[in-house]
């Protein structure tokens, strides 16, 4: 009974609550970083240094009346934000920080499969809103996400060839002598840009395209459902950066001090997230055709070539003794 309680209630809560807290403070960090980059303060009224701003924001959104457009489809309209957040939080389960909540043998495949399911929540919300702006935003988001998933999958394949397994824990072991970002820096660069596009962040924020589509697929959402989408988006950003840190900046795992590994990984993920915000502050939005050209004409040939290269190298050098 107690074991069931721990595995089914306490363990999931112990990873969901910190993720949601991290998401809340990432929104504050974003506003602060953008503020200082635009030579202003950012939120600094609610609590010391504005630290309670995300809590006030969340409270404000959840106590608002959930307004639903009269022409929208009632069930799908409310189901999609819940689906988005559920998927975003489930994706954290196989993350080795340093021990995962669910020890999956094919962790990499699980992450890839679930992140592609997130497309349905965006498409469903755009369609259920019954608004042309929301639908255009949703269609753009789906096209963008599906396109960049191709390059993400191929990059993951190359990294798996390096590591020799689909289990996420093996990445930490494989990088004990050197971070994969050093021998595979082109992969790391392609991966980072693809994660920017995958999470719909600037300069690839076509889903939200404020100057064109009001707010994109979530234009008709207000209050609680909007907050769920918002949480899902930022949880995905943190997840992608944690995954980038695991894949390319692996933390050495000391069994006696697992907390050190967790702090190591989270520091790297936080720094990568700050670079996400820096990119947002620095770059204007791409044109849509340029975005598609980038992935199909540049990233796809490069990632395919790198997969073949990394496959060919060990076979070509198989006859050499290991000490060379």
Swiss-Prot record:
Membrane topology label: Multi-pass membrane protein
Principal location: mitochondrion
Alphabetized PANTHER family for the sequence: NADH DEHYDROGENASE SUBUNIT 1 (PTHR11432), NADH-UBIQUINONE OXIDOREDUCTASE CHAIN 1 (PTHR11432:SF3)
Residue runs in coiled coils: none
Keyword annotations of the record: Electron transport, Membrane, Mitochondrion, Mitochondrion inner membrane, NAD, Respiratory chain, Translocase, Transmembrane, Transmembrane helix, Transport, Ubiquinone
Enzyme class: translocase
Family: Belongs to the complex I subunit 1 family.
Known EC number: 7.1.1.2
GO cellular component, one term: mitochondrial inner membrane
Signal sequence extent: none
Described purpose of this protein according to its UniProt entry: Core subunit of the mitochondrial membrane respiratory chain NADH dehydrogenase (Complex I) that is believed to belong to the minimal assembly required for catalysis. Complex I functions in the transfer of electrons from NADH to the respiratory chain. The immediate electron acceptor for the enzyme is believed to be ubiquinone.
GO BP annotation list: aerobic respiration
GO MF annotation list: NADH dehydrogenase (ubiquinone) activity
Subcellular location: Mitochondrion inner membrane
Reaction it catalyzes: a ubiquinone + NADH + 5 H(+)(in) = a ubiquinol + NAD(+) + 4 H(+)(out)
Record's protein name: NADH-ubiquinone oxidoreductase chain 1
Keyword Transferase found: no
Residues annotated as transmembrane: 9-29, 75-95, 106-126, 146-166, 177-197, 237-257, 259-279, 299-319
Highest taxon of source: Eukaryota
């Amino acid at each position: 009974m107690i074991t069931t309680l721990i595995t089914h209630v306490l363990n999931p809560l112990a990873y969901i609550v910190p993720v949601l807290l991290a998401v809340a403070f990432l929104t504050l960090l974003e506003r602060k970083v953008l503020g200082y980059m635009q030579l202003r303060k950012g939120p600094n009224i609610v609590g010391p240094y504005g630290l309670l701003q995300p809590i006030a924001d969340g409270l404000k959104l959840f106590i608002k009346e959930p307004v639903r457009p009269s022409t929208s489809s009632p069930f799908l309209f409310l189901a999609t934000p819940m689906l988005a957040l559920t998927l975003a939080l489930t994706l954290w389960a196989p993350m080795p920080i340093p021990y995962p909540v669910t020890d999956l043998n094919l962790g990499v495949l699980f992450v890839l499969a679930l992140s592609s399911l997130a497309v349905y929540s965006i498409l469903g919300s755009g369609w259920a809103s019954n608004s042309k702006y929301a639908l255009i935003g949703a269609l753009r988001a789906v096209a963008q996400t599906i396109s960049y998933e191709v390059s993400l999958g191929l990059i993951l394949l190359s990294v798996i060839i390096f590591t020799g397994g689909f289990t996420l824990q093996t990445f930490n072991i494989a990088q004990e002598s050197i971070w994969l970002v050093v021998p595979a820096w082109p992969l790391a660069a392609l991966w980072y840009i693809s994660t920017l596009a995958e999470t719909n962040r600037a300069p690839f924020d076509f889903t939200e395209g404020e100057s064109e589509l009001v707010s994109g697929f979530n234009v008709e959402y207000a209050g609680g459902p909007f907050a769920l989408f918002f949480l899902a988006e930022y949880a995905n950003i943190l997840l992608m950066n944690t995954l980038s840190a695991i894949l390319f900046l692996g933390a050495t795992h000391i069994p006696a001090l697992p907390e050190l590994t967790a702090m190591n990984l989270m520091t790297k993920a936080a720094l990568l997230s700050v670079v996400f915000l820096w990119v947002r502050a620095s770059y204007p939005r791409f044109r849509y055709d340029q975005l598609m050209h980038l992935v199909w004409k540049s990233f796809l040939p490069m990632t395919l070539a790198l997969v073949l290269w990394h496959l060919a190298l060990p076979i070509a050098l198989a006859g050499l003794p290991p000490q060379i």
